[in-house]
């Protein structure tokens, strides 16, 4: 990985020099509040309003669980500077299963018949079964877990990883510009990228679908293969140009790009989910999505 998380001593060495941060860490409470509101706003008159509102319920359950059962201080010494919370090597705390139980309890009273059946399955699953499904998701074997269960398991895992990311040093530096497709904190995939305003005006940051961190990647470069050639920007129409798809003809992938200057309330997970018709258009053109939304998992293999 090409972005390094700095130790306390390294932070002091660079304290007097300013450069745009390579990694931005989320404010958990603010993130969930903004996301839930955005999902509910986008659900108005949307053809997929029911699912957007379901996603908002999940996010609000994450916020409620965060407030009721925050992650205790973790033993996070001797972590790697590169991807310190790597999903494949970091030993997670079993508290994530408590988070899953609390999220399910929050959603159950308003669940329809299909969602209620999924909740019942997860409630009856053994610890070993839950951990096995979590392992498959965290190693990106998404097609081995049914999408209805994956949404809930990922919501609990993400709540855990988001809080763990608050307990590591928050300074970072770019080592080089290669291999920036995966999150430098946990190694997971991006949801989308955001072109920011404010102190980071015009800079593009990719948003992690697990620990919710964001990392800088220069524009006019493929977020998947680093190619600078054969890049094109697409939108369904100019009115919806807030959310665009950047395609790469070299690796035939795409990832959405969002622009805060067009709407400061744009939110990567919510706006990505609400613009699913752009995904359909890109797939019809032969491009494969290079990121993953925590509310849209691939179908399970039969």
Curated annotation (Swiss-Prot):
Keywords: Cytoplasm. Coiled coil: none annotated. Gene3D superfamilies: FdhE-like domain. The keyword Calcium does not apply. One of its GO terms (cellular component) is cytosol. GO terms for biological process: protein maturation. InterPro entries: FdhE-like_sf (IPR024064), FdhE_C (IPR056796), FdhE_central (IPR056797), FdhE_N (IPR056774), Formate_DH_accessory (IPR006452). GO terms for molecular function: ferric iron binding. It is found in: Cytoplasm. Pfam families: FdhE_C, FdhE_central, FdhE_N. The keyword Kinase does not apply. Belongs to the FdhE family. PANTHER family: PROTEIN FDHE. Necessary for formate dehydrogenase activity. This is Protein FdhE homolog. The gene is fdhE.
């Amino acid at each position: 990985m090409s972005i390094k998380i700095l130790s306390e001593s390294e932070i002091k060495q660079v304290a007097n020099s300013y450069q745009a941060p390579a990694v931005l860490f989320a404010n958990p409470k603010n993130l969930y509040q903004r996301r839930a509101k955005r999902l509910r706003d986008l659900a108005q008159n949307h053809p997929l309003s029911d699912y957007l509102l379901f996603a908002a319920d999940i996010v609000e359950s994450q916020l409620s669980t965060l407030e009721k059962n925050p992650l205790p201080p973790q033993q996070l010494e001797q972590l790697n500077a590169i991807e310190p919370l790597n999903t494949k090597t970091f030993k997670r705390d079993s508290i994530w299963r408590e988070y899953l139980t609390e999220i399910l309890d929050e959603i159950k009273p308003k669940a329809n018949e299909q969602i209620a059946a999924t909740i019942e399955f997860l409630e009856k699953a053994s610890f070993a079964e839950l951990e096995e499904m979590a392992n498959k998701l965290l190693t990106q074997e998404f097609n081995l877990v049914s999408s209805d269960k994956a949404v809930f398991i990922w919501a609990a895992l993400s709540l855990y990883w988001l809080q763990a990311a608050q307990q590591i040093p928050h300074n970072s530096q770019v080592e080089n510009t290669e291999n920036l497709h995966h999150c430098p904190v946990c190694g997971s995939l991006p949801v989308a990228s955001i072109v920011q305003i404010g102190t980071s005006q015009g800079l593009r940051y990719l948003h992690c679908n697990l620990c919710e961190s964001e990392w800088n990647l220069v524009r006019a470069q493929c977020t998947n293969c680093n190619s600078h050639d054969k890049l094109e920007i697409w939108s369904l129409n100019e009115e919806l140009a807030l959310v665009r798809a950047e395609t790469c003809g070299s690796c035939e992938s795409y990832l959405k790009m969002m622009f805060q200057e067009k709407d400061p309330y744009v939110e990567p997970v919510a706006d990505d989910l609400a613009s699913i018709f752009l995904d359909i258009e890109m797939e019809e053109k032969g491009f494969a999505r290079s990121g993953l939304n925590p509310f849209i998992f691939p179908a399970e293999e039969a």
